[in-house]
């Protein structure tokens, strides 16, 4: 356990220098060989029954084929001349001298063209701890190991860069090389005490490493895997495969993943998950998804590399090998999202019954629906025919089976006011074969609105009663006002009955008789007065003979002397102070 604590401390101190490739040591270090004493002894006669695989083999702790054991001083190759079967070697934990019955092997069939030697190193323990102390120590070390692996994963996203030639190069693979056992030089030729075996690691680029003293990450992980048993076997072996130790060991050796390949697969998995989050919506055009659940698709058995037998990666990506295309168009992306949503709801058992077919796009309606004009519409497709604006919850008008918004409908189809030429939205007045706003239908002369008495029309214009009669009704010859009701027609004009009187005395004409002078009606007296046919003596009109004297007219019997009152019929008279006198009276009075 002290060695395990030291390995954990060294692993924690070297995590900041880890690259994606494991660091191979250029020379031997104290960490390159186990601390326990190992013995080696050639097997002369193979036993009939091979031993069962150890707990490390069942837990998946199989040494890398690259690992080779060599002694600290020299290396010898031992091959059995007559048998090419691999040798299973086991070493004791406490004894320092090997026992021929402690290490056994079995002949097996030849695998490939090379010989394999499988070794299970065991560590020497100074003292056997109690089970309680052992479990507590293992639990704490496992927790520390989990924390260090998390730090290792974090370092993998920001690794220190190697030079181009080292980053692109990979460690040399074993190829067709045979596994080698290194036997140290001892005093005894055979069966003596063997020195500590050292584990030789291949070197990167001719033996160059990041550090010559620090152990590599792969060697540390190998030591940890061999020291701490895993509670759950990583590899499942069928019962039919347990009959042959060589088959079990070969399967375990093929499925073992090194630390560098595991971290590389972890990086690929994280990158695939990131791509799935970004391009998840773009790759669901057919409505199918591959969920990143961690189990293989189609019921296939998952392989250690993270790829199932069906050939799909359980990383959230589809099985298509074609690269993802460019971003789809907004319309196709919307249709793809709607189709994926509907398929997902159907998979979950949620029934998505279409509410109808849109009258515009002829597609089924699954969300909000607008019902109008006996049809169903998508809300975004129920628009005005003229301006193409969404009508929504506003009022609309129908014309020839097409919807129109209120503004466009009135501008296109509403009646126009004759006065302002604007559309009539509410009440309308129809007059004179035209349409009007109620507030624009008024008297053309005074601008007053028409009352209950109505209006009068003249030359296509509307007038109130007063203005119409004032402007167009016949005028009275006496008062010059419009004649609205009864009238008298005389002297080529119309008269109010109360206005047809003598223009001098304003006396109504009795029996309808009147005298006209200069276009005006007069009574008889004023008529003769105006004409001068009134007797100057009696002040009555002269209808018969008359005498004209002193610029006056007289009845013959009324032309008399102003003093004696005798009729002046002879035609001679004297005038004095505008009065007529006979000859005798004139002589008497003025002579």
Swiss-Prot record:
The modification Phosphotyrosine is found at residues 31, 88, 118, 181. CDD domains: LIM1_Paxillin_like, LIM2_Paxillin, LIM3_Paxillin_like, LIM4_Paxillin. It comes from Homo sapiens (Human). Belongs to the paxillin family. The modification Phosphoserine is found at residues 83, 85, 106, 119, 126, 130, 137, 140, 143, 230, 244, 250, 258, 261, 272, 303, 322, 332, 340, 533. A motif (LD motif 1) lies at residues 3-15. SMART domains: LIM (SM00132). A motif (LD motif 4) lies at residues 265-276. Its main location: cytoplasm. Cytoskeletal protein involved in actin-membrane attachment at sites of cell adhesion to the extracellular matrix (focal adhesion). Recruits other proteins such as TRIM15 to focal adhesion. One of its GO terms (biological process) is endothelial cell migration. This is Paxillin. Residues 17-138, 159-260, 291-335 are annotated as: Disordered. The modification Phosphothreonine is found at residue 132. The modification N-acetylmethionine is found at residue 1. Residues 69-106, 121-137, 236-260 have a biased composition (Polar residues). A motif (LD motif 3) lies at residues 216-228. A motif (LD motif 5) lies at residues 333-345. Interacts in vitro with VCL/vinculin as well as to the SH3 domain of SRC and, when tyrosine phosphorylated, to the SH2 domain of CRK. Interacts with GIT1. Interacts with NUDT16L1/SDOS. Interacts with PTK2/FAK1. Interacts with PTK2B/PYK2. Interacts with ASAP2. Interacts with unphosphorylated ITGA4. Interacts with RNF5. Interacts with PDCD10. Interacts with NEK3, the interaction is prolactin-dependent. Interacts with PTK6. Interacts with TGFB1I1. Interacts with SORBS1. Interacts with PARVB. Interacts (via LD motif 4) with PARVA/PARVIN. Interacts (via LD motif 4) with ILK. One of its GO terms (molecular function) is neuropilin binding.
